Amino acid sequence: KTLGAIGKEFSTLEKVEGFDGNIIDISKPPFEGNFEDLFQLCGIDGNMSYENFEDNYKFNFSWNPDHFSSVLMWVSNKGRTEYPWNSNHVTVGFEPISSAFGLSTHISLNKENPIYKRNVATSIKLFKDKPLYSNYSFSISNL
């Protein structure tokens, strides 16, 4: 079951158009209902933080935004009914990417795709004899 409206843009996690047309806040899981969904957050500056007030910690994550210009946010909110999840799994994940996620490699490489047209890279050029090195860091601290 999908949480967010398909193909809609938003500028804050607190105001995302839902699949049913209502505005939802995806910044504070868990949510009512059972959902599995992905959101592409475009043009991220290479820094994200996640605050867990229940367990009193803050997770900081940074990476090279020249390599990964977006973040794929995946939301698992009891939407996986099969074993071993059995509708009990609740989590949010963040994965730095450079792609037009879910729209194929062909579209990600095409400079006419809607994400690239907004100056957000959707691919990384790799070379056989030149390894790509990319730095990242993460830390956890008390709130």
Question: What are these language model-derived features?
Answer:
Residues 59-143:
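Active-site pocket scaffolds in enzymes
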Residues 1-67:
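Active-site/ligand-binding surface loops and adjacent short beta/alpha elements
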